[in-house]
C-alpha cells in the first residue's frame, strides 16, 4: 500500500467497482442531472459519466524485496449545454480521486453542477473578441 512517511496509508484499499450497485450509480447520475438543471432554466442538456479503476500492483525486486499497492480511482465528469436566444454554450465540471463512490456526496455533486453551470453561463454572456489588425 502507498504510505505516508509516518506509515499511514495514503488512501483506502477499497474496490470502487464493487462499492456501489449499478442502480445506485444511475441514481447518483440522475441526482447530479437534477441539480444541474435546477440551477438555471437555460440548461437544456446534461451529460454525466462515472468511471472507476482498481489496480493491484505487485513489485518484486531482484534483491528479494517485495512491495504491493492497491490503487482505487473514481472520476465523475459533467457537461452541460445552456441555450439563450438561439445561442448554445457548454460548461464542464467534475473530479474524483483515490476513493470509492461514497466520495460523491450531495455537497460534492452540488459543487460539480455549480462549476459546470457557471461556466456555461459565463460562455453565454461572453462577447466576441474584437477583430482587426493589431498595431
Where are these regions (language model features)?
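Active-site bordering "gate/hinge" segments
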Residues: 1-135
Amino acid at each position: 500500500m502507498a504510505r505516508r512517511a509516518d506509515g499511514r496509508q495514503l488512501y483506502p484499499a477499497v474496490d470502487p467497482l464493487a462499492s456501489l450497485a449499478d442502480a445506485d450509480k444511475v441514481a447518483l447520475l440522475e441526482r447530479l442531472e437534477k441539480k444541474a438543471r435546477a440551477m438555471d432554466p437555460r440548461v437544456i442538456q446534461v451529460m454525466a459519466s462515472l468511471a472507476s479503476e482498481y489496480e493491484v500492483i505487485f513489485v518484486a525486486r531482484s534483491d528479494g524485496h517485495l512491495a504491493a499497492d492497491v490503487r482505487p480511482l473514481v472520476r465523475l465528469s459533467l457537461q452541460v449545454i445552456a441555450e439563450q436566444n438561439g445561442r448554445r454554450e457548454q460548461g464542464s465540471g467534475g473530479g474524483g480521486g483515490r476513493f470509492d463512490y461514497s466520495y460523491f456526496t450531495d455537497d460534492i455533486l452540488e459543487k460539480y453542477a455549480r462549476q459546470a453551470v457557471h461556466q456555461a453561463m459565463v460562455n453565454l454572456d461572453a462577447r466576441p473578441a474584437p477583430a482587426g489588425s493589431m498595431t
